[in-house]
Amino acid sequence: MSAVYGANRTKYLDPTTTNTLSRGLFGGKLRVAVDSYEASTLTNGSTIAVGQTLAIGDKVVAVLLSCDALGTSTTLSIGDAGSATRYQAAVSTQSAVAGSIAIPADGMGYTVTGTDDTIILLTLGGGNATGTVKVTVLYVKE
C-alpha cells in the first residue's frame, strides 16, 4: 500500500516559485449564484444566460440543474459561448430533472479565462420547452 499526494497537495507541502498554487485552489472563497427561468414555448436552439458574469481566474466547481418536464425530446446542456457542454452534456428534460450535477472532468475546476467563458449558458435542444428551470453555480474566487 502506498501513501501518495495529489498534485495540489504536493505543491502546498513544498511551495516554490515554479509550483505556486493558482488562485482559489486552496483557501479560496466559495461563491454561489442561483438563478431560474420560466420557459414558455422556448424554441429549440435557444440559450438561457444564468448567474452573474464570472471574473477572470474564477474556478467553476459545479453547476446544478433542476427543472420541470420541459417537453417531448427536449434536452439542456450547460456551458458557455466557448463550449456549449463545458459543464454538462445534453441531459434529457422530457421528465423532471432533480439536481443533476454530472460535470465532465474538463469542466470541474475550470478556470475562467475571460475570452468567451464568463457567462454560463443553458442550451435547449430537441424541441420547444415549457416549464421552470433552476440553476445553481458554485465557483471559487480568491
Write out the residue ranges for each language-model feature.
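Surface-exposed, low-hydrophobicity beta-strand/loop segments enriched in small/polar/acidic residues
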Residues: S2-E142
